[in-house]
Amino acid sequence: MRDRTHELRQGDDSSDDEDKERVALVVHPGTARLGSPDDEFFQKVRTIRQTIVKLENKVRELEKQQVTILATPLPEESMKQDLQNLRDEIKQLGRDIRAQLKAIEPQKEEADENYNSVNTRMRKTQHGVLSQQFVELINKCNLMQSEYREKNVERIRRQLKITNAGMVSDKELEQMLDSGQSEVFVSNILKDTQVTRQALNEISARHSEIQQLERSIRELHEIFTFLATEVEMQGEMINRIEKNILSSADYVERGQEHVKVALENQKKARKKKVFIAICLSITVLILVVIIVISTLV
């Protein structure tokens, strides 16, 4: 059993620890000066934040390129290659962030041993918040790509209707899309239909794009699945983190008000002391004058 007499002797300091924790929660990376281990930790946090910003910019760029390709009936190979390169960059950034988050994740043994440590809880808070941001961003990217897939399928469906191939049902269309082979997909469309070469080329291009997109979605999903599960399990902790941060900001604000009031009170107290000192001096002076006059008389 652990010797906790030292903790009992410092029972009065528990509220001070809580106050320190509140302050630690709102410390911005780079502003703390707590020693080498913490400097190294905050440097890693800064790196993760920067990588998340890069990922966010790439996702935004991906969205723009997808809109451009959707608006182009027959996108050039260079456009499709640029889009695929962007997807590859996003996947690599996702892997980098996952590894970086793993590097700052508090070890279970360390967390259990130092559960009441302000430093440990601060590290868990930072890791939880960054993980949540990463998962939300990847979810957004996956949702965006899923919507892009549906729009490509809709373009194929529209082309089939225009070329009198509208007898292909949605179920049959999905089965052809799932075939994974553009040749099989195109040959199925050609059966008993009159499809123009331009329409056929667009349908084939859309199908190829859908195949690449589905591979990208699967790979991206695999990158963050473990982290999404962890964040989901820590959902309650994330909510507590948000609550702690908000209460910390309120605590700091109230602390500033208290300091302001204390300074005002201190100023008033000084004025009172000066006033009392002047009154006493005048009283003593009057007494001295009275005594001197009495002596002369």
Swiss-Prot record:
Question: Which cellular component terms (GO) are annotated to the entry?
Answer: caveola; endomembrane system; neuron projection membrane; plasma membrane; SNARE complex; stereocilium
- Topology check: give the Extracellular ranges: 297
Residue stretches spanning the membrane = 276-296
Q: Give a yes or no for keyword Membrane in this entry.
A: yes
Q: Which residues form a coiled coil?
A: 43-163
Q: Which GO terms describe its molecular function?
A: SNAP receptor activity; SNARE binding
PTM sites of type Phosphothreonine:
T31
Q: Which Pfam families match?
A: SNARE, Syntaxin
Enumerate the subcellular locations listed in this protein's record, separating them with semicolons. Answer: Cell membrane; Cell projection, Neuron projection; Cell projection, Stereocilium
Domain t-SNARE coiled-coil homology positions: 200-262
Which residue ranges have biased composition labelled Basic and acidic residues?
Answer: 1-12
Source organism, top-level taxon: Eukaryota
Q: What does this protein do?
A: Plasma membrane t-SNARE that mediates docking of transport vesicles. Necessary for the translocation of SLC2A4 from intracellular vesicles to the plasma membrane. In neurons, recruited at neurite tips to membrane domains rich in the phospholipid 1-oleoyl-2-palmitoyl-PC (OPPC) which promotes neurite tip surface expression of the dopamine transporter SLC6A3/DAT by facilitating fusion of SLC6A3-containing transport vesicles with the plasma membrane.
Annotated family: Belongs to the syntaxin family.
Name used for this protein in its record: Syntaxin-4
| Organism encoding this protein | Bos taurus (Bovine)
